């Protein structure tokens, strides 16, 4: 709200909230009050839905605007009220609109000398009998005590417009000409009692801290269920918990042996169910028992100390309490007094209770309900726990005691021997208890643990092998781990600060690290890392390996030159190819271990890899790459000691062969009693293994490798008689011959 603006007026019906009716549903006897929070303003209103015009003069058209002077009533029907507040300097507020559904009710005549406060007070008393709450209206009228002597004359809708002064003119108004009528607070005698839902709704809308029937303050006990003045039920406070236990509601849990309240479903210490513990476990009853004077617990007669509080029990001669029933009341006639602990009646002159030994005559700060034993206020008329009338019972007990005292007063010469509690009950002893299965650390123990954690953290920080913070300059001097940390940290920082390098390094898919070199030139240190590239395409089917240097050396050393037979060329080519592959493996540091050297256990990744290339798998390249990235071994074997590459060949998953070879799988690994390689198995499959044979030859599988029978894969292809498979080996041999011929031709030209 801006400074200097006028607050909009409020249109408030002056009535008690009616159950089942909305705020806009009123009758023709209900007064409407209009007020604004801005002081010294005039309120103008209309009742036909038109805009209030306070500057319009008489004689210039129809004027339906009225000036508010006192609370008004509305005619029956649907009435739309619009009001505006105007200050003395003609500053206007916003227009507020309210629609009321007005019902017709016959008017109730009230004497003129009754003011609004008396009417409210009388109507509140009548409404409270039926469950209405008027505390909210009392608060509302308390804020306007300066209008205590309101004139409640009814101002009905006038027949002619009200005269309104022009701008800057004097103020004047026509006095009301209607007779006075009473406001609509009359109580209907035939109204039915309210339901609990209606009472809850009225209390939620008005004041839940007061009784809905007698408007008395709510009992101080938040768990009281009945009003202590009228005895009607009091709705519970929202979000209340279990009531606090009384003294007699505490007991020992059978599981943890802790003194816990017994009015809860489970033990608050060990969470054991208490319902089963409260049921009697046997039908045996004590024939004789001794009541403890300290806590009032019944104990077996042969015990000397109480089983509950461990206090000394009176001897059998002193105790007159045996059996399950209380001893008879004293036979002497006269006044009696009730014990506040066990409820037994004792003589007026008794200092202690003859049943439980409690001291009598202690002024109680609260009254105890004789039915449920709950504590109530001294002035309470009804019990807040069970709802019975406490005043009447107390009065009856007092009348009875007075009648007995008046009938035959007790002579003072008579004496009554009542066992008093001895001061020297026994020597005090320190008894230690132990809770089995439970441990509660103390504050000292927790502080000690915190100190140990802090000292351990300090020791770890001071350790020599603790990872230090990275610096701008690497340490050098043989600290290769710190050097690698320095390289990785600065490489990450460089990638974060250079988008171009970040985009380039994020694109390729890299495998294992093949080689790494370090070069120093005095100013800079160059580090080169070579990784194997991974792609979904088959990069090994048509890959030609340049073995010119090795073939050249073999051709120069040969005595027959080009005049040798085809078999000699094939053997030379195969031997040179195998030597070259071994050298490449040594350069790339492929450390392959055969099954005879080390038998590895199948880890989950290896098991999934064998399943993917097995008969039930699909041989998906992406899945195989993911498993290899997660740590699967490309040289693992199944239960039959077959390498994974051989399993892929036998199950016709030729797409997985290049991926396994790239990740370090031994392509010439032998298995079984026949010592066959993957190329042998692919050749034995015939046409079904033609694609696997071509893939293995493209990955430089050894043709010269022999099995246990002394046969190469080419020999097996010739035995099967499959021309398509044999042509693959011939193409491989032809490529080798062409390379050797080209190398020999270049040597002869150099000699010339």
From Swiss-Prot:
GO terms for biological process: eye photoreceptor cell development. InterPro entries: Ankyrin_rpt, Ankyrin_rpt-contain_sf, DZAN1, DZR, Fn3_assoc_repeat. The modification Phosphoserine is found at residues 160, 182. Residues 164-187 are annotated as: Disordered. GO terms for molecular function: zinc ion binding. Its main location: cytoplasm. ANK repeats lie at residues 605-636, 640-669. Residues 174-183 have a biased composition (Polar residues). Pfam families: Ank_2 (PF12796), DZR (PF12773), Fn3_assoc (PF13287). GO terms for cellular component: cell projection; centrosome; cytoplasm. Keywords: ANK repeat, Cell projection, Cytoplasm, Cytoskeleton, Metal-binding, Phosphoprotein, Repeat, Zinc, Zinc-finger. A zinc finger (DZANK-type) spans 211-270, 339-387. It is found in: Cytoplasm, Cytoskeleton, Microtubule organizing center, Centrosome; Cytoplasm, Cytoskeleton, Cilium basal body. Involved in vesicle transport in photoreceptor cells. Interacts with NINL isoform 2. Associates with DYNC1H1 and multiple dynein intermediate and light chains as well as actin-binding proteins. This is Double zinc ribbon and ankyrin repeat-containing protein 1. The lineage of its organism: Eukaryota, Metazoa, Chordata, Craniata, Vertebrata. The gene is DZANK1.
């Amino acid at each position: 709200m801006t400074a200097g603006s006028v607050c909009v007026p409020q249109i408030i019906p002056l009535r008690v909230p009616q159950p089942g009716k909305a705020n806009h549903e009123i009758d023709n006897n209900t007064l409407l009050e209009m007020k604004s929070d801005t002081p010294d303003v005039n309120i103008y209103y209309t009742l036909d839905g038109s805009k209030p015009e306070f500057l319009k003069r008489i004689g210039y058209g129809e004027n339906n605007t009225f000036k508010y002077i006192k609370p008004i009533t509305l005619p029956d029907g649907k009435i739309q009220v619009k009001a505006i507040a105007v200050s003395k300097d003609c500053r206007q507020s916003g227009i507020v609109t309210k629609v009321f559904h007005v019902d017709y009710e016959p008017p109730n005549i009230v004497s003129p000398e009754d003011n609004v406060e008396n009417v409210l007070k009388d109507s509140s008393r009548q409404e409270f009998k039926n469950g209405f709450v008027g505390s909210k209206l009392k608060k509302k009228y308390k804020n306007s005590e300066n209008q205590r002597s309101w004139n409640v004359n009814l101002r009905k809708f006038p027949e002619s417009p009200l005269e309104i002064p022009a701008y800057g003119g004097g103020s004047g108004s026509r006095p009301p000409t209607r007779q006075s009528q009473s406001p609509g607070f009359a109580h209907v005698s035939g109204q039915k009692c309210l339901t609990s839902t209606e009472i809850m709704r009225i209390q939620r809308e008005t004041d839940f801290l007061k009784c809905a029937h007698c408007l008395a303050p709510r009992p101080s006990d938040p768990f009281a269920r009945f009003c202590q003045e009228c005895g009607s039920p009091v709705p519970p406070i929202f979000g209340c918990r279990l009531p606090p236990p009384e003294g007699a509601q505490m007991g020992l849990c059978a599981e943890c042996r802790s003194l816990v309240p017994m009015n809860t479903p489970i033990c608050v210490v060990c969470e054991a169910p208490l319902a089963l513990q409260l049921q009697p476990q046997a039908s045996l009853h004590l024939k004789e028992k001794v009541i403890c004077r300290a806590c009032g617990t019944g104990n077996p007669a042969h015990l000397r100390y109480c089983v509950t509080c461990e206090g000394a029990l009176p001897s059998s001669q002193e105790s007159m309490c045996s059996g399950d029933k209380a001893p008879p009341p004293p036979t002497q006639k006269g006044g009696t007094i009730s014990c506040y602990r066990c409820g037994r009646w004792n003589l007026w002159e008794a200092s202690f209770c003859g049943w439980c030994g409690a001291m009598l005559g202690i002024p109680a700060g609260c009254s105890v309900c004789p039915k449920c034993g709950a504590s109530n206020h001294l002035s309470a008329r009804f019990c807040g726990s069970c709802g019975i009338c406490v005043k009447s019972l107390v009065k009856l007990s007092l009348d009875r005691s007075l009648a007995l005292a008046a009938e035959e007063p007790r002579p003072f010469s008579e004496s009554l021997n009542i066992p008093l509690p001895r001061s020297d009950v026994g020597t005090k002893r320190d008894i230690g208890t132990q809770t089995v299965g439970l441990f509660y650390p103390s504050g000292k123990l927790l502080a000690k643990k915190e100190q140990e954690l802090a000292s351990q953290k300090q020791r770890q920080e001071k350790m020599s092998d603790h990872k230090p913070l990275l610096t701008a300059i690497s340490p050098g001097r043989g600290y290769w781990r710190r050097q690698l940390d320095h390289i990785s940290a600065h490489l990450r920082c460089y990638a974060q600060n250079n988008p171009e390098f970040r985009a380039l390094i994020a694109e390729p898919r890299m495998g294992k690290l093949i080689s790494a070199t370090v070069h120093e030139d005095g100013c800079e240190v160059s580090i080169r890392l070579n990784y194997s590239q991974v792609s979904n395409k088959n990069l090994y089917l048509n890959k030609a390996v340049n073995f010119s240097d090795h073939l050249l050396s073999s051709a120069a050393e040969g005595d027959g030159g080009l005049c040798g037979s085809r078999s000699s060329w094939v053997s030379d080519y195969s031997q040179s190819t195998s030597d070259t592959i071994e050298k490449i493996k040594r350069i790339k540091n492929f450390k392959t271990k055969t099954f005879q050297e080390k038998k590895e256990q199948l880890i989950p990744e290896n098991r999934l890899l064998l399943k993917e290339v097995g008969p039930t798998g699909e041989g998906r390249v992406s899945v195989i790459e993911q498993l290899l990235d997660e740590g699967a071994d490309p040289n693992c074997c199944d239960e039959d000691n077959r390498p994974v590459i051989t399993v892929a060949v036998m199950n016709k998953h030729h797409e997985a062969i290049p991926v396994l070879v790239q990740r370090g799988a031994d392509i010439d690994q032998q298995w079984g009693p026949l010592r066959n390689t993957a190329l042998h198995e692919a050749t034995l499959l015939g046409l079904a293994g033609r694609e696997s044979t071509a893939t293995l030859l493209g990955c430089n599988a050894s043709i010269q490798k022999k099995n246990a029978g002394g046969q190469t894969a080419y020999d097996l292809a010739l035995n099967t008689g499959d021309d398509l498979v044999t042509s693959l080996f011939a193409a491989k041999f032809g490529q080798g011959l062409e390379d050797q011929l080209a190398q020999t031709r270049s040597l002869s030209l150099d000699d010339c």
